């Protein structure tokens, strides 16, 4: 029945609720309105609030497993430290009154996080370290992926983990609209979310400080407040926290504690004290006590006091052994004892057995991979974490008077050259090698190897450069090789020497590593032959070391050496 004013009869009723939109239900003849279910809306909002913490935890866990990190040990810290980031991301997706806009922002943020974690996963797989801000700003991350083969091989080797990274993004795109509430969050709600997140952050930071008195460099406190150890921090606290610490230290600076000698220096036992008749104390003429009093700079004072507190070193039976010798210093890419084999690399084996064998010699992956290894080799110093130490030193015109290059020039050496068989400005080598006294040549700067391959041949580099100095009265030469670079399944040098290792009972990667170092062995064979022919072999000191261990073959260190089989 319908009244003259057009309203319905009493068979249908309208129920209106203050503050809630009415929802029409039923047929055209029997319409009624019901109140929306509050619990359903609350569940969708709660699900959205939980989405970003779970997303980041998923990405962190996938990255850790793919990188071989301990997942359980740092699980709690990783999760708790991401709550603030998660809260910020949720609020960024809740500012607009239009739900579609908020959902679009959430999709973009999810994609950005996924891609960034993927980049870090592949970068670590190739270089054994994480991308830090300085690598991005210096263009190093872009330079690093200088070969599409390198990228594709790294992705292929971690394809399962790469696919898993994109699972949350696919899930969000397909089901996000049904499962989550993207409506705007009121100011009061935003403040509550932020306060809860900050409370978790403060509590987690306090928990980190519990072992602040620990001397362990890998303690929770030292990892968080000490020198940034990218990989260790990423394993314990997660990638996000590592990036946050890196950015904060870049923006606000970081002052490390300078270690001082706990033993008081005996002022009477300096140059006049000789423990044995033939030993002499090696002491500079600098008066550090006077220098300490002459400056108001606290950092300089700390350094002067530290140097003044140190006991001098003394001459020994090796002092002066190589006086007047020519020097060839070689930093061999990813070199290790596993590349030394009497059958595969006989020249390296000969050099090892007839030369000095250093024990307790450790070479880490470093924070910035090869260039940090070079920095340690050529300066004798530990590189600063989070920056390109060698590049920065050249940029700031830092003097290194004790490097081989500078000392060789001081002693009147006629030829002081450095060579690299890759792009000349990679890692800014053209700046820092010249800054420490070398005349530098590389691909694109005076060195042409006649082929464009990755990596280039160490043998060809020797063949193209030895004539530059072999006839000089005295020379000091530095080489940075590249044939042993990781990615041995596609390494051109591995392929070039593949027939020599094909029958070994190892994985293709291990055989590729050995094959790549055969090219280094050929380079050493050529170098020694040229030195002998020129009559320079007996008065030339050759030092060969690595830039870092072969991190792309870290499992190699748990397997027997080829020469043990």
Task: Identify the residue ranges that each predicted region occupies.
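N-terminal targeting leaders characterized by basic, low-complexity, disordered sequences
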Residues: 1-26
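Solvent-exposed soluble domains appended to multi-pass membrane proteins
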Residues: 296-559, 563-565
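Membrane/wall-proximal cationic-aromatic binding patches
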Residues: 229-326, 337-339, 344-349
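Transmembrane and membrane-interface helices of multi-pass
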Residues: 25, 29-283
């Amino acid at each position: 029945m319908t009244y003259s004013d057009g309203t319905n009869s009493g068979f249908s009723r309208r129920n209106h609720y203050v503050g809630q939109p009415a929802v029409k239900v039923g047929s055209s003849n029997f319409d009624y309105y019901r109140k929306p279910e509050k619990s359903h809306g609350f569940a969708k909002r709660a699900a959205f609030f939980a989405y970003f913490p779970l997303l980041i935890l998923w990405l962190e866990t996938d990255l850790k497993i793919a990188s071989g990190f301990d997942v359980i040990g740092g699980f709690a810290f990783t999760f708790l430290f991401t709550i603030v980031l998660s809260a910020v991301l949720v609020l960024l997706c809740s500012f607009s009154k239009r739900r579609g806009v908020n959902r679009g922002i959430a999709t973009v943020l999810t994609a950005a996080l996924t891609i960034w974690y993927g980049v870090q996963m592949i970068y670590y797989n190739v270089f054994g370290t994480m991308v830090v801000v300085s690598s991005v700003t210096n263009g190093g991350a872009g330079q690093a992926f200088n070969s599409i083969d390198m990228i594709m091989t790294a992705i292929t080797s971690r394809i399962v983990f790469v696919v898993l990274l994109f699972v949350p993004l696919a899930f969000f795109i397909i089901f996000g609209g049904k499962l989550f509430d993207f409506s705007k969050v009121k100011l009061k709600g935003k403040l509550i979310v932020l306060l809860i997140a900050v409370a978790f952050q403060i509590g987690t930071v306090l928990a980190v400080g519990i072992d602040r008195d620990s001397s362990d460099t890998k303690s929770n406190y030292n990892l968080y407040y000490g020198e940034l150890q990218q990989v260790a921090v990423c394993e314990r606290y997660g990638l996000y926290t590592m990036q946050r610490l890196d950015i904060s230290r870049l923006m606000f600076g970081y002052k490390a504690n300078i270690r001082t000698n706990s033993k008081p220096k005996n002022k009477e036992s300096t140059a006049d004290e000789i423990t044995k008749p033939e030993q002499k104390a090696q002491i500079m003429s600098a008066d550090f006590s006077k220098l300490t009093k002459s400056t108001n700079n606290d950092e300089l004072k700390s350094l002067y006091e530290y140097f003044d507190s140190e006991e001098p070193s003394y001459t020994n039976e090796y002092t002066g052994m190589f006086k007047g010798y020519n020097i060839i210093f070689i930093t061999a890419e990813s070199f290790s004892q596993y590349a030394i084999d009497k059958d595969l690399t006989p020249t390296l084996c000969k050099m090892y057995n007839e030369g000095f064998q250093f024990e307790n010699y450790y070479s880490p992956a470093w924070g910035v991979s090869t260039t940090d290894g070079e920095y340690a080799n050529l300066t004798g110093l530990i590189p600063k974490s989070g920056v390109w130490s060698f590049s920065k030193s050249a940029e700031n015109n830092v003097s290194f008077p004790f490097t081989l290059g500078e000392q060789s020039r001081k002693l009147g050496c006629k030829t002081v050259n450095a060579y690299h068989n890759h792009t000349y400005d990679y890692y800014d080598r053209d700046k820092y090698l010249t800054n420490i006294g070398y005349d530098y040549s590389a691909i694109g700067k005076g060195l042409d190897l006649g082929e464009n391959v990755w990596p280039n041949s160490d043998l060809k580099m020797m063949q193209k450069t030895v004539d530059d100095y072999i006839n000089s009265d005295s020379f000091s030469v530095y080489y940075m090789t590249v044939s042993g670079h990781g990615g041995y399944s596609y390494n051109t040098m591995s392929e070039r020497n593949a027939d020599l290792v094909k029958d070994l009972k190892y994985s293709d990667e291990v055989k590729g590593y050995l094959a790549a170092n055969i090219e280094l062995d050929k380079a050493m064979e050529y170098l020694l032959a040229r030195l002998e022919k020129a009559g320079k072999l007996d008065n030339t000191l050759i030092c060969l070391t690595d830039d870092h261990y072969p991190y792309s073959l870290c499992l190699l260190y748990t397997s027997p050496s080829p020469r043990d089989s």
